Amino acid sequence: MLYRKPITVCLASCSVQETHGSACDVSSIAYDSRAVREGSVFFALRGTHAHGAQYIHAAIDAGACAIVHDCPLDTYVVGVYYARVPDARCALSSAAAAFYDFPTRALTVIGVTGTEGKSSTVSFIAQLLRLCGKRVGFISTVEYSLGDDILPNAEHQTTPESLTVQRLLAEMREHSCEFAVIEASSHGLSTRTARLQDVAFDVAVCMNVRHEHLEFHGSFEQYRFDKANVFRALDAHDHIKDGRRVPSFGVLWAEDASAVYFREATHKPCFFFKRGTGAEQRTAACLERMPCTLLWVQTLPQISQALRLRFVLSTVQEPAQPAQDGAHDVSVPLEGAFNACNIAASFLVLHGLLGTSLAAFAQHVQYVQPIQGRMQRVDMGQDFEVLIDYAHTPSSFEEILPPLAARVRARKRRMLVLFGSAGERDTQKRAMQGAIASRYAHVIVLTDEDPRGEDPMGILCMIAAGCEHKKLGKTLFLIPDRVAALRHIFSLARAQDLVLLLGKGHEHSIIYAHTVQPYDEERTARELLRASLSSDTLLS
């Protein structure tokens, strides 16, 4: 669909401080001068390494008829409309929403935040809504959908810029979607980026809050505050979508230390999930506001490769007398006990929006599929196990490594782990990652993740500082080249060992200072294993 709007309509909700030139109609919006075409409005955004004001003349040469900026300009080109605003990023979000006719006014929007589990939970919610017969689109780190096909997300951004968010939401509306599920990162929820500023959220989900992204937020408190913006957003509008009122609520993990903080960020009701059998006494402080809905989730002994869970749904009227809906067992074709919380949160979203019962949910959830790069098995016929996972934080290491290590110990074999840490990101977590991996892995291979502008070997040395009791060249290897690192860890693996490839997951590139190298972890692993098996066959 083609859009065209007067620039004054796009900027109607922005605090325009001054203008130069005559207003015009715009046919597209751009914040990258290379994307400008005839009739575009160009937003000059402040970036990490440069300011968009440097590219205003390039944008005009490419056909921009309007410029939105937040800094003083020395010259103004005749025939071009200029609008100065306090913050060009905030203005971009508002203008994009207006340009695309406010798409979230027609969509029931579910925002999923948290340090771990966002992408999987977004995917599970979208899959389950579809299994209930609903038209749904979604945006996540791994992939996105406008209602039909699922497409890979080629960017390294969890939440895209506001212009992309509004465009994708508009396309979901055009594809007759009723629901949109958005992975809401702390960056995207920050007022500094304003990427989700003009999204009318109806449901907010927070999986957990752990140590991450302090290089951007500056402190854990600011990190938590920014994440809670998705809960504050629930109180910002009336939840009337295309003339119908939709339910609005929050979903929280009762055991998380920040659950009370997030519950108090909204006046809307919150549903909770908690690990246990349902027989335990209520202990979570977040449950003090009653009545409240509480879902107990218990992990049952695994059969084959399916995750088996027992759910008990309670309505807590008072601490001693919760009303329970009986126990329901479900089987989900997923790896990893951590997915229990992701599935529990997904149920509460469906329960709150559609009134889905546990019995109906049990019928649907057996068809849920894992997403790429999350506990993904690679089997080329080798005699050892290979798993790929996106885990790249200390908390995600603590979540996945202990149960895998226990599984390996039970068969008296070894766990070999390959990972790195992103450059120009939180440096405090690097030694922590090394220390956690050292506790559970027999062999560690450190390699590039996304070094960006940092020295790759310098990053690996910072991780290695936490790898106590590992001997360099014996049980600890520093190999920046990721392909070479994979080749080496496969060469070390013995029969029945477990090889974990962490950090890249679904991503399709490695970012260096001056280049972006195409890279696919699954494809690379398959090619190396295939070559190794062919070589072994020839030698035998």
UniProtKB/Swiss-Prot annotation:
It holds the Pfam family Mur_ligase_C. ATP binds at residues 114-120. The modification N6-carboxylysine is found at residue 227. It is found in: Cytoplasm. Keywords: ATP-binding, Cell cycle, Cell division, Cell shape, Cell wall biogenesis/degradation, Cytoplasm, Ligase, Nucleotide-binding, Peptidoglycan synthesis. The keyword Ligase applies. UDP-N-acetyl-alpha-D-muramoyl-L-alanyl-D-glutamate binds at residues 33, 158-159, 185, 195. InterPro entries: Mur-like_cat_sf, Mur_ligase_C, Mur_ligase_C_dom_sf, Mur_ligase_cen, Mur_ligase_N, MurE/MurF_N, UDP-N-AcMur-Glu-dNH2Pim_ligase. GO terms for cellular component: cytoplasm. The keyword Transmembrane helix does not apply. GO terms for biological process: cell division; cell wall organization; peptidoglycan biosynthetic process; regulation of cell shape. GO terms for molecular function: acid-amino acid ligase activity; ATP binding; magnesium ion binding. Pathway: Cell wall biogenesis; peptidoglycan biosynthesis. Carboxylation is probably crucial for Mg(2+) binding and, consequently, for the gamma-phosphate positioning of ATP. Its EC number is 6.3.2.-. PANTHER family: MUR LIGASE FAMILY MEMBER (PTHR23135), UDP-N-ACETYLMURAMOYL-L-ALANYL-D-GLUTAMATE--2,6-DIAMINOPIMELATE LIGASE MURE HOMOLOG, CHLOROPLASTIC (PTHR23135:SF4). Belongs to the MurCDEF family. MurE subfamily. Catalyzes the addition of an amino acid to the nucleotide precursor UDP-N-acetylmuramoyl-L-alanyl-D-glutamate (UMAG) in the biosynthesis of bacterial cell-wall peptidoglycan. This is UDP-N-acetylmuramyl-tripeptide synthetase.
